[in-house]
Regions:
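ANL superfamily adenylate-forming
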Residues: 24-25, 148-198, 375-377
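Gly/Ser/Thr-rich phosphate-binding loop
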Residues: 286-294, 303-384, 421, 425
């Protein structure tokens, strides 16, 4: 591959980090021009770089690469394919392909001429896959040949008909590779481009679906441009940068933020098919990457992995992502010699973001006073029993005090109005569920993030938990994320997820942690460890030792099924343990013990 190197790479000389104000101002400068050119889409950004540096690598994988000129031409072929296939402005094309160069080229090209591209999770099968396709109502589906069986398996559940095009197999009846090869790759004429503007919908990106069926969030061309240039500014990206992206391209962080931040700056994106802890550092060194995009669980997996001879031979200057917890921040940065961490908070469908440009360990960001109008965020108190916002005598929501956890909300509107745009979902009813009205004044409206946060005395926001993941036990709120951190820090625990389970005759829900362990795990010492880390009400009452934990493609844990199975040894084949209220240690939970809990003989 062009530009690949091997062996030891000389570490760059330590450069003084730019001030927070300069970082913010750079991002503002790069995004300020978006509104002045409403007909300029992200594909035009690629074209501009293709004119300036045609031979520089834009996208690369282990076995292929495209320079900027090649990417520009590939985008044009996909745009002309959409037109030739009859894709009109607003029509949807579903994309079911693994990470790769053509993934990015496809959605950039199809959306350039007004098509809307639905980015479908490649791990879905059956009814789940049919649901996501059905929500999008596509006229066409582009599917990788290796994923065609999954699509065929979902066909009986599909209620919409779409033309299916196969990618990667020229022998198929509708082979998109063959169709693309027959099309011109030169610049599009004004007539071919049509009247597409930044206000138009470009993509459908699905929520993770950890608690239910995924919802399709609407992503406009404006949002793509803002994400790309904003992160290019925050990271100080240049054409010399190479970013490693091993996150799924069908999600907003891996598929839009990571590649577009580099392409906006003329840099290069190295795309891995998926995350691999064993391949991660060799890839970083081999491709001479200067940045990588992370999510928090990726960092935790890397810390749990055995040392690699490559982990300190990199030339990284910055890593960017979200979800890096405070309990591993310092260890992660020190072990892997990472000069700077840019942590941020954002929701695919949300209308405000937070950015920790100062590198404050454990914080997800702050809002500088000069940008308060651009990122209008607040924290409101919630009813601990039902999760609804509390209201005062006048009927308005109650702001949280410093240090107090509450739901993060963002005011809906334009920047000029002191708000942020909320583009919502494809279903109006789902959009309405996320809007909180008459919050601090009659007639105002705010986006509900569904996330609990607290604001510290320095003005930094800290993530506490997802509202649906928090439960009450012994009259106290338990944040599952904090419990997970404590459990994972115990010797021999590879992974953990925590949830609440109901016990007959008790109020609230008791904590239960499902864990994956190795040979170093000793259950008899776990209770003492947790007693040092957690208050009594937050310590898991039950422990389940599982072979593996189910998670989404971005490592968000799926715990609904675990919660339904509960702690009944008759329904769960995994080993179960209970925190004995008499001894304070974890003991085996068998059928006899379960019956005593059910009868109230053992009171927890």
């Amino acid at each position: 591959m062009n530009g690949m190197t091997t062996g030891v790479i000389e570490q760059p000389k330590a450069a003084r980090a730019p001030s927070a104000s300069k970082i913010w101002l750079k991002a503002i400068e790069l995004t300020a021009r978006i509104e002045t050119l409403p007909g300029r889409l992200f594909a035009d950004v690629v074209d501009d770089w293709a004119q300036r540096q045609p031979d520089r690598i834009a996208l690369a994988t282990d076995d292929a690469s495209l320079d900027y000129e090649g990417l520009s031409k590939r985008i044009n072929r996909y745009a002309r394919w959409a037109r030739s296939a009859g894709v009109a402005k607003g029509d949807t094309v579903a994309l079911i392909m693994p990470n790769g160069i053509d993934y990015v080229a496809a959605w950039l090209g199809i959306s350039r001429v007004g098509g809307v591209v639905a980015l479908i999770n490649t791990k879905l099968v059956g009814q789940s896959l049919a649901h996501c396709i059905g929500v999008a109502k596509p006229a066409h589906v582009i599917v990788a040949h290796e994923l065609k069986d999954a699509l065929d398996g979902a066909s009986p559940h599909l209620k919409t008909e779409a033309k299916v095009w196969t990618h990667g197999d020229a022998r198929c009846e509708r082979a998109i590779d063959v169709a693309l090869a027959a099309l011109d790759d030169g610049p599009l004429s004004p007539g071919e481009r049509g009247d597409v503007t930044i206000d138009d919908r470009a993509l459908l990106i699905y929520t993770s679906g950890t608690t239910g069926m995924p919802k399709a969030a609407s992503i406009s061309h404006r949002r793509i441009l803002n994400w790309g240039f904003w992160f290019a500014g925050l990271t100080g990206a240049t054409p010399q940068d190479r970013l490693y992206d091993c996150l799924p391209l069908f999600h907003s962080v891996g598929g839009i933020v990571a590649p577009c931040s580099m392409l906006a700056a003329g840099g290069s994106v190295v795309i891995a098919e998926k995350f691999s802890a064993s391949n991660f550092w060799p890839d970083i060194v081999r491709h001479d990457c200067t940045l990588f995009q992370y999510i928090g669980e990726l960092c935790r997996y890397l810390l749990k992995a055995p040392p690699s001879e490559y982990e300190n031979r990199h030339r990284l200057r910055l890593v960017c992502g979200n979800g890096l917890r405070g309990d591993i921040w310092d260890d992660f940065q020190a072990r892997f010699a990472i000069p700077r961490i840019l942590e941020f908070y954002a929701a695919t469908e949300g209308n405000f973001s937070l950015f920790n440009v100062e590198g404050q360990p454990g914080a997800i960001g702050r809002i500088p006073p000069l940008l308060a109008h651009r990122f209008p965020a607040g924290l409101v108190k919630l009813d601990p029993d039902n999760g609804a916002p509390l209201r005062n005598a006048e009927g308005f929501c109650i702001p949280c005090a410093r240090g107090e956890a509450g739901e993060a909300i963002g005011r809906i509107g334009t920047a000029d109005e002191g708000g942020g745009r909320f583009e919502g979902y494809t279903e109006a009813s789902e959009t309405e569920k996320k809007i909180l009205r008459d919050v601090f004044a009659k007639g105002d409206s705010w986006f509900r993030t569904g996330d609990l946060m607290r604001l510290d005395e320095k003005g930094f926001f800290h993530f506490v938990d997802r509202i649906g993941d928090t439960f009450r036990w012994k009259g106290e709120n338990v944040a599952t994320s904090e419990v997970n951190d404590a459990v994972r820090d115990f010797t021999g625990v590879i992974d953990a997820t925590t949830y609440g389970v109901s016990i007959p005759g008790t109020d609230g829900r008791a904590g239960m942690s499902a864990i994956v362990v190795n040979e170093g795990f000793a259950v008899e010492a776990l209770a003492a460890h947790l007693a040092q880390r957690l208050p009594a009400y937050a310590r898991p009452v039950f422990i389940r030792i599982s072979r593996e934990l189910d998670a989404t493609e971005t490592f968000k844990q799926k715990k609904a099924e675990l919660a339904r199975e509960g702690f009944d040894p008759g329904a769960v084949s995994d080993p179960l343990f209970m925190l004995d209220p008499k001894t304070g240690t974890y003991v085996v939970l068998d059928a006899e013990t379960y019956a005593q809990i059910d009868e109230g003989t053992i009171r927890l």
